[in-house]
Amino acid sequence: MGLLSACGGLSESRQIPRLTQENVNSFIVEQKKIIRENEDDAEAHFGLSRGYLLKKEYESAEQHARIATRIDPLNPAYYEQLGTALYALQRYSDALTELGTATDLDPERVSAYLLLARVYEQIGDTSRAIAVLEEILQRDRYYVEALFFLARLQLRQHEYDSAIRVLDELIRLEPSNREALLLRIQAYSTQGSFYYARTLIEEMIREHPDYQPLQLELLRILFSQGQWGEARTLIKNLESGTKANAEISLLRAYLELNRENFETAKTQFR
């Protein structure tokens, strides 16, 4: 997950630029200069926290986000930023507290709800994560990231029909979203609808002929259907055009074992 994108709130009076690896160091220097002149500048502490977050200096990011909340305890963006830093530090219980404060202060703050869902996923509470995502979509039904996240969790819960409905809506919004297209294919293949999954793969592969995850999904379907000849041909194509891939090697070994070619299979594990 892009942690910087999780914290969407910016101060109304001072716009923080889009931070990149190229400008983050100079931005941090600027914020430190502001703080030296006024140590109670909450926006500068907030900006400094975001800079440290990009540099993966998470403890410093937490420290300055916490200072910002103390200076301005009613700004939901600061609590979301603090929750983001705590999430990066894997302090999930603390993250839930701060993100809860952010959403209490601003119930329409969907970016904070999205991070809440990620925290619940990390602690294994998938049902709560799904509930949070559904709440997000009540506020913004076109939030693509939430739609994709929800579909992925629904698949994990074996809620195939629900996941497919969500993915259909997402693909209607973004017809070229290949991650969503692939996840819909996986939803059909996981529930055993191999024929329709292959039909979708054939449609998608015309636009994305070199998309390896799509080819791997086709390979899994071929194995599930016992179509060894097609699987062998596809494995050869994948091996000639990609870097070493553990899953491809494992599937080739299984294929060779199925063909009772034990010596060839054994070479895949040397």
List each model region and its residues.
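N-terminal leader/linker segments that initiate helical-solenoid repeat arrays
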Residues: A6-R66, R70
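Register position in tetratricopeptide repeats
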Residues: L54, A88-L89, Q122-I123, R156-Q157, ...
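Canonical positions in the second alpha-helix
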Residues: K33-I34, I67-A68, T101-A102, E135-I136, ...
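Structural marker of alpha-solenoid helical repeat scaffolds
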Residues: E37, I71, L105, R139-D140, ...
